[in-house]
Structure formats: C-alpha cells, structure tokens
C-alpha cells in the first residue's frame, strides 16, 4: 500500500503539471478533459486489450488509495467545503519568484485613518517605511504610553523621560482607589521596572488567588523584578534640580518625542528641559545577540539659542545608580562600587529562592562631544540599598554637549550554565560582559542592529492594502521576538514566557496556556527553534506534572493552570477542579511541533518528548472521566472551560472535545511508534459527551442557559485550533455554534477571542467576508497607541469592564493576531493522515485559501518553515500560491473540498421548538462534480523544491442577493460600543453587528461602494437583530464624473509631489485630466437641507478617504463643487419590529438562533431632483451615510444603541 500511495502522489503531481496554464482564473476545467485521448486503431487487437487493462488497473489503484485516504485519521478534521463555480484543482509549475502583490495607494492611504480608531492615537505617529512608532505627548507615567526594550532574556519598561524607574501616576478614566494597580493575582502598583527571564520567587500568599486553601500545601511562584538597570540621573546647581522620572514635571518639558524602532528594538527619547535651555536625548537597547547586555546612551546638551544673556557655564552631576528599591519581591544579597573601573554592582535573590540570584554590574563612559578622553567618576556613593557613581561635568557654549554610554552586564543563575565553575560566578560574568563592552558603543550598536535584521530575514508579512493591519502584524512579530530567544536556552529547562513577557509583572509573570496555544504557534512557522524552546519548558516540568497526578490519586500527569519556577499545584494554579484543558493545550503544542517538522524533529522527538506528554494526559483523562450509564456516554465534572465566567461546571465543551481529540492523537501516535495503546482511549474518544441543545447548538457546558455572556472564545476553539470537526454533521453544528456564540461574547472580553473567530469564519463560511471583519475586531478595540501594544481588554476602565485591571502588554493577543493571518486567512493547517495498513502517520500541510474582498491585493507570508523547508504563501486577489523556495525535500499538500459547507441552511426559532423559520436568504448553491483524483475531502499534491502550487481562491458568495454594499469599505462617523467595528455591518454575516455607544445621539456609518459605481440604490433592508432602532435615514453624495476622476488620481499625485512647487505644477495637470476648470462652480446642493449635517458628512468623508483631497481643496478654494452636500434619499423612516418578542426563549432558557428584526425600504427618486432636470446619473453614488436614531424600546435599562447586523442595498 505504501508503494501505491507513493505512485498516487506522483501521478497527481504529474497530472497537475499538465495543467500549467499561467492563470487559473479563466480556466474552464471539468476535471476530465485533460485525460481524454484520441486513440488510433491498431491491427493487433490484443495490444488494445492490454492497454485498456493497464488503464483499468491504474484507475483501480487510484480508487483504492482514495478509499483508504477517506478512512484515515487527521489532526485537523475539517472535511470539506463545496463552492459554486469553484475549481479546486491546482497547478504545479516551476517557481516564478517573489510574487509581488499589487499595491493600491488609495486603499493604503485610507487604511491609515484606522489608526485614529485606536485608543490614545491623537498624539501618536507611525513611520511605515522605517517601522518606527512614537508619540509627541509628554504625559504623566502610565503603562499604556510606555515602550520597552527586551531581547528574550532581559527587559525594561521605559518611563516618560526615557530611562530610570517610575511608578504609574495616571489613570485615564478614574482616580478611584486601586486605579493605578495591576490585576490578578498581584494587584500591586504598576511600575516601569526591569525583568530577567525565568527569575521567579516563591510567595506564601498573594493578594488575590482562586483557591486560597492551596496556600497551605505549596507556595505560589511569580516573577521578581530586578533593580532598574536603565537608572541614570543628573542634577544641576548643587543638586537643587534633578532630572529623573520623579522630579521632571509636565511644565518642565517641551519639544518632546519618544519612539520605538521595531526594526532594531531601540527606544529613543528626546526633549527640551527647563525653558528649553537643555536638550536631552537617550537611546536604550537590550543587545539582541549578547543577551546579558543592556545599553543606555544619554546626551545632555545646551540649547544655545535659549540660554540667558549672562550664561557662563552649567555644572552637571551625572549619577549612575543601582537602587534596590526599584526591585520587587527580591532580597538584597550585596551591593557596592568598583572604583577601579568606575562601576557599581548589586546582587539580588528572588524571595524564598536562595539557590538563585541575579547580578547587575554597571559602568559608564562619559565624554564631551568630539573628545576622546573619558571623564572618570569624581565620587562613589553607597548606602544600605543604593550604589552610585557620580560624574561631574561643566557645559559651556564651547563644550555644549556631554555623551554618556552606560554598559550593564546582567547575569542570573538561570542563564549561567557554567555556574558550577568558580570563575564563572554571576557577578564575575556580569562584570566581564560590561567591561568587555565598555568603549565599544558603535560596534555593539552595529552588531545589535544586524542581529535584529537577521531575525527579520526569517519572517515577513505583507498586507499591501492596509497599513494598520500590516503594522499590527509586524509589531506582533516584534513583541513576540523581543520576549523570546533561541540562544542559551537549556533543553532541561526550556523557555518560560509569561503573558506580558519581560516588561511587566501582569499575571505575576506566570506561564499559562497563553504560551502553548497563542504565542508558540505564532512563532512556530517562522522561528521553530524558539517555539521548541517554549515547549521544552513543559517537557522540563513534566516530571512535576506526574507528581501532581500522583498526589490526587490519578495515573499519568496533570499540569497546573499556572506555572513558574515550578509546576506544582498552587492557589493560582490548581491541578484539579479547574481548567483541565491545560493538559490538552500542552499536548497539542508539542504535537504541533512534530507536525511542523523542522530540523531534528522526527520520530525520536515524537517518541521521547511528545509521546510521554500525550500518553500521560490520556492516562489521566481515562481515569478522570466518568461513565453515565443513562446516557451511555462518558462525562466530566467540576471543571472550568476557557470561559472563566462559568466556574465549576460539568461537561465543558472545549474540554470534552479536547479529551476526545487527545485520545485520538494518543492512539495514532502509539500505533505509529509501536507502543502499547490502551483500547479504552478509542472507546472514550468515541463516546465522550459533548452537550448540545435541542437545536443542535453545542452548549458550552451542561445546563447552560440563554442568558449566558461569554468571557472569551470557548466553543469556537473546537474549530480552531483544536480541529475537532470530523464529520459533516459536526461541521454543520459548528456553523451554528459560530453564529450563536458570536452574539454572546462579552463586549469587554479579552483580546484572545476574535482571532479564533477569524480562523473559524474563514474555514466554515462560504458567504460574506466576516473572517476579515473579525480580523479588524481583533485589533481596533485592543491595540494601544503609541507603541502598538495590545491590552488584554477592549475597555481598560476597571469601573466599567467588570473590575478587570488588564494585563499589559498582552502578548497573547500578539500571538492570536498572527495566527489569524498565518492560519486563519490562509487556511493553512498542520495535519496528518494515518496509513490504514501500516498505522504510520504521514504529515501534510492543508491549504484552504479564500478571496479577501476587504484586503485588496491580498497578503503574503514570506519564509514560512515547514518540514525543514522554506515556503512563501501568497494570497492575491485571485489565486493562492505556495512557493517551495528553499530546501531539498518535497512536501505533501492537501486542498480541502468546500462542498459540505451549508452556512445559510439555518432554521430560526419560531416560538416553538418544533417550528423554525428559514434563513433570511437561503437558496440552493450550484455544485460542480468531483474533479479527477480527488477524494471526498480534498485533493492532494506533492510539491517539490523550486516548484509552486497555485490554486484558484474560493470566492465566498453574497449573503444577501444583489447587495451592492456587501464586503465594501465602511467607517463609523460616531462612536461605537467598545469592541465593535463598522465592518461588521457589511460583512455578509447576520450574526455580527455594529452598535452605537449610546441610544441618545444619532449614529452614522459612512459606506464607500468603490470607484465608478454604475448602480443606483432603489431598495434595501436593515437587519437589526433583537434591538432595532427608532428610525433610519440614508443619504448619498451625488455622483459626478469629474469628481470621480479627481478622486481616482489625487492620492498618487499628492504622494509623489515632494514639494510645494512640484505640487502646484501637478495640480493643473490633475484638474485638466479630470476635465475641471478652476473657475468652475457647479451647484450640487439640489435640495434644501434642514441643517448643515450633510455638509459635515462631506468633511468626514474627505477626512476618511481623501485627506489629500481635503488638502487640495485648501490649495484651491474655488473648487466649490467639491463642497456639495449629501442628499437624503430616506428621511427618518420609523422602524417597527418585524419579529415578536420570544419570551419563552428567555423564560425557558432555550438555546436557539432567533430570527432578526428587519426593516425594508424603497427609494422614490421622483421626489428628488439634483442638477439638470432629467439627469439621473447623480443617483449612481459612491458614498452613502446610514444614520440611525435611538432604539425601538426607549425605556429599557440598556444605554447602548441599536444593533446593526447587516445593511443591504439593492439596485
């Protein structure tokens, strides 16, 4: 059978090569034409028979192989999607190169307006070309406005002045008690501190825990911070004026700028101080290759233009300080000065861990600009817990600038592999690193930048149409890389990565499932060694997990919910009666590394690393589940699923689906390795209970009612990353689940939710573009300016978000967002199939790309690592391509067949469990026959080195027939509920929505139908869900061919006009090309408006789509025709509910998908006239404003506005 399978793959590849047309878009293939031959008759009849017999045998071999493949097992179980007019056959051809994506300058420019939707962006900026994020606002210290530096070993959060230690002093929302605190479990004052990887302490009790009774059986382990190594200060006039984070006030600072370069991880701060007399510039970086080295550069200079007339000189004392008081949860071991080397040092130990310490050794070079002679420290200063060196300098107009370079060596027991050797003590190594670096600033800076550039050579993501999304992808990659490393990670310890990495003690720096399910998979395709280091931490703590199981009388192993220095059961990280799914998460992460198959990951890794984890988890779950004889199924009890709003429930859906899937993995891996396989695993996997409602919606847990509000993605995790779908009925249930739970996520829930919905929507839905609207929903509510760091919550105000102080930065969201692109939009999955004869696992890559209408030009993922090969994955506007660009081994690829997806076959509740309404737009889908050499679940390809596989993208259909607005661009002109994005109103998904922030003010959405729209709106519909508005209005901007021509060219011309003279020269040409004389005044006002609201809409339009055009109008104010008004074509139409209130649904807690209220309308243009009589071209508008007012039931207790689920506009 193995030989037959090999022949089958080669035959498929050969067949694909026959179809080597350069474009799949226009190919009309039936799947059989390429095989039809015209055979000539031969005189020898037996020869003909022989040929026919061989052909029959060949076809039989293909059929048998396909039959076996149909029965084989998978990690990812999605079995198909059928599409109308979709040809799933791909073309294998020689590689064509880089596949440069189309660049649309208008879309790119428009996307930059999305930055303004980010929290706190009003004084922020982003340099797209140089990947620099920054702010011009000098404010009080608050965590979300602070950048950080890190290199995977050391890290430091940087306060407002650019260096030193600072406590937060500002909360945007409230000054209530606790407003400046971090969240669970420390609930301590937030601070800009310094951290070292794996530097954990032990605490007998914490401020907040889940299971305080467990404090009696084991200490909790949380991260310790070390003395702030960026601590430089300087003072003036006999120390009467200090420059440090505590003493610099807002009034002291002008000309402020602080930025973070994502290209090289350097934070630069510049400002003028003391009436602009002194200019201060600092640069801080953690060396990317020499991990124990931190560097601070400080320049202090006189602004000679602002000095008083009697200025003579300025005495400056520069302090190099190590202060134990800037460290948390540590014990001071020793501190002192090294006068010979102008250095200070300090050694601290984490609380209650005397076997560990961290040594910090700091030394400086201080020079006048253009001088080669360093200045020695004039004084050393030591107190009980502070050591410092003081450098006295004098600034004059002849010597106006002093440059300080601070070199800090930082060495912890956990990083020092050679600590057993006497000459390699932590303080000895820290000293050696600092002194060897001293005086080599430029050389070190160059090597640091080179190390970062080399990292980016291994990974790059392009989204040419959207600057914000591309920036978020790049910043997410940066933040994950800054907090992880490949170098000097012991295989017997691994790399523990906390939720907030190396710049914060949010969540106590502990390791959660965030590392296994969110961060590690995002790094695996680009940096498999880093991902393996992270997973090795779980392997290193596996022996403790076995002890945990033994402690509670179970076989196998049980990982605690939280881990740190140890993985014992604690009050923050219980092992039982809580989130058992952590054991599935750890196993899945390890198995994914095997399925990715980078260098050295073979059956030995599977046998000695992955198998013990999965086997022990299987053994534990086999003992943990209980058989319910009434149901004839296995159940689970007293647990918490990922939705932590529901604790101590039974039969958590994700947990039970995870057990089912893990036991399947255990069986397959055991058989593959020839190990003993417990037959009970297959039995439980087959018969574990997944609770469902009578309407076949998966219940998150047994007894769930209809009033549920979900904290975060839970049931949807069964689709991704678990890959639970394994038959058509479960696929159809998963679609219902996606719809149902999309409407029940908490508006202020964590940023780990919607990346999962991206992947689920892309894989499950054959209509609309909600995979992309969910992508925006993953970013806009959660990303914080100015330094593109994710917050855990969409709403950071703990008084309105359920008393949650968000973790920050939230690396979990960075990992989730990257996965939504890498695996969600591309449909890429690591997968496997089992040979039914040999029981051997065969790894393959699943590729299921779809068109991305909200991302014109597509996406590109460069240097994706798979099976130790390097791939490029390209999704353009028409085709999906995998390029085998490096390596010498073929890879197996599977393209799923989308024919089983029926995402509109949803019957609504109709007041009775036995009666349900059909879906809004249910209709039959044209289906094509199965192509040649394609089993029911997909088509297989063998991609060889230097080849590429190109497949036509699946084109999702319109959710509502002839809706000219669906999948178009949209923005909200008024505020929405935190967490909502306007894209949801046009995404073709009836279960996403945009909701105004309040029901008092008029809410507006602005729609762009795109260039040269030839259709006029004659009717339409608004889908409201369960909360309709009180009234609705629609306005359009009258169409003008001249304005359209101007719009089409202005962005490119404005971008390419480098100066005012060139701009003036090109404006005339621009207007001539558009056929617009400058003197021309055209009255498009048409109808008298009641107010200037419609003119405001024009200004909003120009601000959104064409800031360049707004600038052009300022240059040529006589272009009055550009200032025309929107015209109302629907004016304050009252809204009436189209559906009754289904009281029984709530009273009886029925889990049902309820029908949506809807308002239909028609447009009567006879009552409207714009421009010349008889001219109707103005109706073919491009821009539309939809305005809603209030809610139908104004007397309810909810202050939020109506829910707008879908806007349908028909011609």
Curated annotation (Swiss-Prot):
Location relative to the cell: Membrane; Vacuole lumen; Periplasm
Top-rank taxon, per record: Eukaryota
Coiled coil: none
Function: Periplasmic acid trehalase that catalyzes hydrolysis of the disaccharide trehalose and required for growth on trehalose as carbon source. Growth on trehalose is strictly respiratory.
Pfam family, one: Glyco_hydro_65C
Entry's Gene Ontology BP terms: carbon utilization; trehalose catabolic process; trehalose transport
Membrane-side (Periplasmic) residue stretches: 68-1211
Post-translational modification: Glycosylated.
Impact reported for residue 27 to R: Abolishes its ubiquitination. Normal protein targeting to vacuolar lumen
Bilayer-spanning residue ranges: 47-67
Residues that hold substrate according to the record: 513-514, 711-712
Protein name according to UniProt: Periplasmic acid trehalase ATH1
Annotated EC: 3.2.1.28
Side Cytoplasmic, residues: 1-46
Chain spans, region Required for cell surface targeting: 70-131
Bilayer topology: Single-pass type II membrane protein
Family of the protein in this entry: Belongs to the glycosyl hydrolase 65 family.
Active-site residues, as the UniProt record annotates them: 644 (proton donor)
Glycosylation sites: 98, 207, 238, 247, 255, 259, 325, 370, 376, 488, 539, 568, 628, 638, 696, 705, 879, 897, 910, 972, 990, 1031, 1049, 1064, 1147, 1157
Encoding gene (name): ATH1
Catalysis performed (reactions): alpha,alpha-trehalose + H2O = alpha-D-glucose + beta-D-glucose
GO MF terms held by the record: alpha,alpha-trehalase activity; carbohydrate binding
Phenotype of the disrupted gene, per the record: Abolishes cellular acid trehalase activity. Abolishes growth on trehalose carbon source.
Enzyme class: hydrolase
GO CC, alphabetical: cell periphery; cell wall-bounded periplasmic space; fungal-type cell wall; fungal-type vacuole; fungal-type vacuole lumen; membrane
